[in-house]
């Protein structure tokens, strides 16, 4: 049985109990959320070392980190390093987007070493292997994508991105209205190329019931991908994007009816003034399914700083109701991220997630900031560093920017605001 089927039967699973304890909520709250499809717990029955996380309504906003090999950088060891960096920095999940080297081995090593849920985009592997097996992506037999999905499911993948909403109906909207950047989703572009070349409907849509059978067998959470997501601000919230979202909403109902956990992916590049509307629309059309967003990135002119542009959008999206943020690294649009980029991306997304959790009133979120404020009032440097979202960086700044024996900080010195005000208020404080 899947987590959803257990919930529908009124059974609290081990995974639900772990999530409830982590979130500081009642088990019944998790049970009801999973039952309604408003919370998912990606947890493949074959991922043995998994510490499950819940994603959805009323829970803390989660962060995903993308890792994986490329043709130019096929070394699996580097991806394991990135995995460890991401988890240490606070990633709640990772996705293996490998397209180079031994893709199967990369995925299995990541699963073996990952305590957090692992996701994939099966179409990536199907496309890469189709080139070697059949000569091109468009020559791929329909059967092959399902063989790849089944293989990844057996390995223990917890959630998969599948671009099931890419249909000839949604493509018509794209053709009729046009775009500056057309399609920027890799999985989406592979799927559309196959559809147009073969003049056949998307097999993941056409044979959605077969996909559900595989997902149900292993309790994989389906992450319904947005193959028509906007790749620049100019293309945001157009008819093609919305048409795909309507189709995904219909598929959400079919997945739930089959007992399969499902979440929905959202747009990548969106102006700030459109973010809240996008989230509200998704929640309405997709029946309050958990919303997984890439960023969204709020301006197109900041290569090298897109961890910042995405954190801005992510905070607004999550505060508006999005549940799961896919990080963006400083290397976005420029190249494959290294482990330092991975850390920067995770930290930026975690900041966005936490800021949103405060706005949403998530249990315990505001209290973290109050504890930090009290540590600052007391000028307790050790406690401030401990409470930091990135303690290592905070510690380095404290050590490198100040004389080791001094109780003052190099910013304020004898003009410390805490010291001056405390003298007049009659409260004790060290100098900062």
Swiss-Prot record:
Co-factor(s): [4Fe-4S] cluster
Example GO molecular function: 4 iron, 4 sulfur cluster binding
Disulfide cross-links: none
Name listed for the protein in its UniProt record: Phosphomethylpyrimidine synthase
Annotated substrate binding sites: 66, 95, 124, 163, 185-187, 226-229, 265, 292
Protein species of origin: Thermoanaerobacter sp. (strain X514)
Binding site for [4Fe-4S] cluster: 409, 412, 416
Keyword Cytoplasm belongs to the record: no
GO process terms (BP): thiamine biosynthetic process; thiamine diphosphate biosynthetic process
Gene name of this polypeptide: thiC
Record-stated family: Belongs to the ThiC family.
């Amino acid at each position: 049985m899947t987590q959803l089927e257990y919930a529908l039967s009124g059974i609290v699973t081990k995974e639900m109990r772990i999530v409830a304890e982590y979130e500081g909520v009642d088990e019944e709250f998790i049970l009801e959320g999973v039952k309604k499809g408003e919370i998912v717990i990606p947890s493949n029955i074959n991922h043995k070392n998994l510490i499950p996380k819940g994603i959805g309504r009323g829970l803390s906003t989660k962060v995903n980190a993308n890792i994986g090999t490329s043709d130019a950088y096929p070394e699996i060891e580097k991806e394991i390093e990135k995995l460890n960096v991401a988890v240490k920095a606070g990633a709640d999940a990772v996705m293996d987007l490998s397209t180079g080297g031994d893709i199967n081995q990369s995925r299995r090593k990541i699963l073996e070493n990952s305590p957090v849920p692992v996701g994939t985009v099966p179409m990536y592997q199907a496309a890469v292997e189709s080139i070697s097996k059949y000569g091109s992506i468009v020559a791929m037999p329909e059967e092959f994508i399902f063989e790849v999905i089944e293989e990844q499911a057996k390995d223990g993948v917890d959630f998969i991105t599948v671009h099931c909403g890419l249909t000839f109906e949604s493509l018509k909207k794209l053709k009729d209205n046009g775009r500056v950047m057309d399609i920027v989703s890799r999985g989406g572009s592979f799927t559309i190329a196959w559809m147009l070349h073969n003049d056949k409907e998307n097999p993941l849509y056409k044979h959605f019931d077969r996909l559900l059978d595989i997902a149900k067998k292993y309790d994989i959470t389906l992450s319904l991908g947005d193959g028509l997501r906007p790749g620049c601000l100019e293309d945001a919230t157009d008819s093609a994007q919305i048409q795909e979202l309507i189709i995904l909403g219909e598929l959400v109902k079919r997945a739930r009816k089959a007992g399969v956990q499902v979440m929905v992916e959202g747009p990548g590049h969106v102006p700030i003034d459109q973010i809240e509307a996008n989230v509200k629309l998704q929640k309405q059309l997709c029946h309050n399914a958990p919303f997984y967003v890439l960023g969204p990135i709020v301006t197109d002119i900041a290569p090298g700083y897109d961890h910042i542009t995405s954190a801005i959008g992510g905070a607004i999206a999550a505060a508006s109701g999005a549940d799961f943020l896919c990080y963006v690294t400083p290397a976005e649009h420029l190249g494959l991220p290294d482990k330092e980029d991975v850390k920067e991306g995770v930290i930026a997304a975690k900041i966005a997630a936490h800021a949103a959790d405060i706005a949403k009133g998530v249990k315990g979120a505001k209290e973290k900031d109050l504890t930090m404020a009290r540590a600052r009032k007391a000028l307790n440097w050790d406690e401030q560093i401990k409470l930091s979202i990135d303690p290592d960086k905070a510690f380095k700044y404290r050590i490198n920017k100040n004389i080791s024996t001094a109780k003052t900080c190099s910013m304020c010195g004898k003009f410390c605001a805490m010291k001056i005000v405390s003298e007049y208020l009659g409260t004790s404080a060290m100098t900062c």
